[in-house]
Amino acid sequence: MFMLYHGWKSSASRRVRLCLAEKGIKYESHIIDLARGEHHSPEYLARNPNGVIPLLILPDGRSLYESSTINEYLDETYPEPPLRPGDPYLRAEMRNWVRYVDERIGNLIVFNWKHGIAQVAAKLSDAELAERIRKIPSKERQEAWMRAARKPYTPEEEGEARRKLVLMLDKMEASLKDGDWLVGDRYSLADIGIVPFVKRIDEEIAPDEVTAGKHPRVFAWWQAVQARPAFAEARIRPFTEP
């Protein structure tokens, strides 16, 4: 059986849970406490040197990490229902969408981390913070922890992050003029990749933008996504829930 090391609120973890649910793949769940730094322990880093979640342990014991890599592997090995277009050009378009969304994760962190990690990080002494940061393999995440602990994002920075996320909705709106889904005529990994972002935009960051008035095609897409059985199974719940 697969083992998934993940977090309920982690955007990347949500992507993989959505893919697993769409495929009907059962797995053993292991929750990682990001605020406690469990993903930076020597044991975890031995499995995933990037020190991020999710981490998927295959039935044969091998490890996979990075959500887009995991999801493509799952679609390769469990091809039904297909979550990648059959046409090579459309598959390339799908990967472009996933890459585009990945590049905007920093804008989401501005809002997501203040709900948990920032509250823990702010209470650390300078020595404790230095020790915590020392264990983080990514310089980008080291800087994010330092910001969360000692220099919270300003209203201006939040405004800029919000603006960039709304631009993502604009791009979606334009793409959806050709059909119900982002790429081709089927729900794909492109849609799965962006679901965690739209969820957060809708519930807190810019809910007035995910409406029939502002982005009607995105609004219809979002209703269709939430109606899929896999959405409930993947537990994409409000961020403010424990």
Language model segments and positions:
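GST-like domain detector, emphasizing the conserved glutathione-binding G-site
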Residues: 1-137, 152
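Carbohydrate-binding/catalytic loop surfaces
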Residues: 239-242
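Acidic/polar loop patches that form or flank catalytic/metal-binding clefts of enzymes
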Residues: 83, 232-234
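GST-like fold's C-terminal all-alpha helical module
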Residues: 103-223
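A late-sequence structural motif
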Residues: 228-229
